[in-house]
């Protein structure tokens, strides 16, 4: 969790960069929270302030098991999704080549439509996060159209996290094509 405008992570700060290369850059450009959450993928969550960071941390910890030998237990009572499951037919297009927003589908499947998205600003073509179905905690992985390298990296990291915590994974496939490089994206007809 990195706090916008406050958290930074880099190997060499602006003075060293300027001395070594002549390039002028700010702390934020080199290693600010927003950059690490959206471009490098180093950080998973971007908080607006310290209180928001604590809220995010509490939400994450509430979804992870406290014992690595036992899986999360299902809760006995749960809330239905906030959006009717009957609306799924309107969310998923009949043309399988047409992408749709996986979050709309998840909102109709997950208990109380309560989804904690993993790295929401990074690899935006892939949606990963924590939720529950009928009280059973699950990890969810889906994609909004073609899978790009950042999305594949994010999915890999999320799969590792779920495996380490013993969390089952639900895969929701919405791949219209696969992008290997940015040059390949220009050549493909999706």
PLM feature spans:
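Active-site loops and adjacent core secondary-structure elements that bind or stabilize anionic groups
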Residues: 78-130
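Long, structured protein-protein interaction/assembly regions in large complexes
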Residues: 117-137, 141-165
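Short, glycine-/Ser/Thr-/acidic-enriched flexible segments
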Residues: 7-8, 16, 51-52, 133-138, ...
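Conserved structured catalytic cores and adjacent interaction surfaces
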Residues: 168-173, 178
